[in-house]
């Protein structure tokens, strides 16, 4: 834990009390954080202490990395961006009740501050004003043990070196240690109470002797001690309960943070699933593809009206379809057209609007295309392309198609 409220951030860094996992924030020479880092003209950095050794009497007076000449600290500059990033880093409070012995991290039994997320730039303010676990040196004696900042009142009630007045009202003021001895020594404490012996040689005018007054004073002292012990127990129990509540609050906050992270993860997963569902929806209502027919011209020589050159089968959702191409028309009524026939083989029985788009290359002369849809056994001509395509000398035929299923609007 940190001792002495006058501690500075520079001391904390130089004592190695802060460890940063990112090596970019640590000095390449001493490995301590670059609290007061400086860099040469070429951007190579180190902490101020290491630079002072480099330019010192026995130093090489050159950059440890690029060997550029460094005669004084005036030849160096600050990396303000890096300094700002370092001070943004979050660390645990130094009063966390943990100490490191070698490579072993030991959690001390007296506990400590639970804060784990303090920006370095706010660390000193937290330690001095918020934490309560700062170790304070007793101002009454160097022989007295230090105490935690949150235990100031308890320490003042118990410190054996603190000056107090005698509770028996004798007027004596001394350290608590000496006052206790004073009270325990017979006849050493004489209360400042006027005693009148005019009517009674062994007492005052009211018949109360000195011994009774001393007994009364001692009773008052015992009552005060008992009261202080009860107050001490109440404070100890209260501190224990407060510490337990702080622990519970810390772990609750940690759990909330974990739950928030889980919520964000679930949101990402939901977004991914939603995207996948949308893609599945697209695949269930639409299908596009390309049909390539090599040796197109040779195949035309052996075909006539009503003969198809190719059949392509595919699924859209649970519906199975086929596409057939009739170079000379699927019937004599359609002779002179290239018929592209879309038919449904099986699937769900419901009415659909079918959108079929094709583009064909590979004919020697200009032709029109007739698109037919066969939902069952009867053909329905759904579109007739009026546009034509340019003559191609290729010996292959390419058909690009896209089929969209849309529910009919009644």
UniProtKB/Swiss-Prot annotation:
UniProt comment concerning the protein's domains: The MATH/TRAF domain binds to receptor cytoplasmic domains.
Principal cellular location given in the protein's record: cytoplasm
Protein name: TNF receptor-associated factor family protein DDB_G0279745
Coiled coil: 216-284
Family: Belongs to the TNF receptor-associated factor family.
Signal peptide as annotated in the record: none
Gene Ontology terms: cellular component: cytoplasm
Zinc finger (RING-type): 27-67
Cellular compartment(s): Cytoplasm
Pfam family, one: Cep57_MT_bd
Alphabetized UniProt keyword annotations: Coiled coil, Cytoplasm, Metal-binding, Repeat, Zinc, Zinc-finger
Species per Swiss-Prot/TrEMBL record: Dictyostelium discoideum
InterPro entries linked to this entry: Cep57_MT-bd_dom (IPR024957), TRAF-like (IPR008974), Znf_RING/FYVE/PHD (IPR013083)
């Amino acid at each position: 834990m940190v001792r002495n409220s006058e501690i500075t951030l520079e001391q904390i860094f130089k004592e190695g009390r802060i460890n940063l996992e990112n090596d970019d924030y640590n000095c390449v020479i001493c490995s301590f954080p670059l609290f007061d880092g400086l860099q040469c003209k070429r951007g190579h950095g180190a902490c101020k202490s290491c630079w002072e050794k480099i330019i010192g009497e026995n130093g090489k007076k050159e950059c440890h990395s690029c060997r550029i000449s460094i005669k004084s600290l005036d030849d160096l500059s600050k990396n303000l961006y890096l300094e700002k990033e370092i001070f943004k880093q979050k660390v645990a409070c130094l009063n966390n009740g943990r100490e490191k012995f070698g490579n072993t991290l030991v959690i001390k039994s007296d506990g400590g501050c639970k804060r784990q997320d303090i920006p370095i730039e706010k660390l000193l303010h937290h330690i001095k004003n918020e934490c309560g676990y700062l170790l304070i040196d007793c101002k009454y004696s160097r022989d007295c043990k230090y105490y935690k900042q949150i235990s100031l009142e308890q320490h003042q009630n118990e410190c054996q070196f603190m000056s107090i007045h005698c509770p028996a009202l004798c007027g004596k003021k001394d350290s608590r240690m000496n006052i206790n001895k004073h009270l325990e020594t017979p006849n050493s404490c004489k209360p400042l109470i006027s005693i009148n012996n005019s009517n009674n040689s062994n007492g005052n005018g009211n018949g109360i002797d000195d011994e009774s007054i001393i007994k009364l004073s001692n009773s008052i002292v015992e009552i005060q001690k008992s009261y202080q012990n009860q107050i001490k127990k109440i404070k100890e129990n209260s501190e224990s309960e407060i510490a337990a509540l702080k622990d519970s609050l810390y772990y609750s906050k940690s759990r909330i943070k974990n739950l928030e992270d889980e919520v964000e993860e679930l949101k990402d997963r939901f977004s991914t699933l939603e995207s996948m569902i949308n893609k599945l929806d697209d695949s269930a209502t639409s299908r596009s593809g390309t049909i390539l027919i090599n040796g197109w011209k040779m195949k035309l020589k052996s075909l006539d009206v009503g003969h198809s050159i190719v059949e392509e089968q595919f699924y859209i959702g649970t519906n199975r379809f086929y596409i057939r191409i009739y170079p000379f028309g699927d019937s004599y009524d359609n002779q002179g057209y290239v018929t592209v026939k879309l038919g449904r083989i099986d699937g769900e029985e419901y009415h659909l609007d079918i959108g079929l788009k094709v583009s064909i290359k590979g004919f020697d002369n200009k032709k029109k295309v007739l698109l037919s849809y066969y939902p069952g056994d009867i053909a329905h001509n759904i579109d007739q392309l009026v546009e034509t395509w340019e003559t191609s000398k290729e010996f292959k035929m390419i058909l690009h198609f896209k089929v969209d299923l849309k529910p009919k609007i009644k």
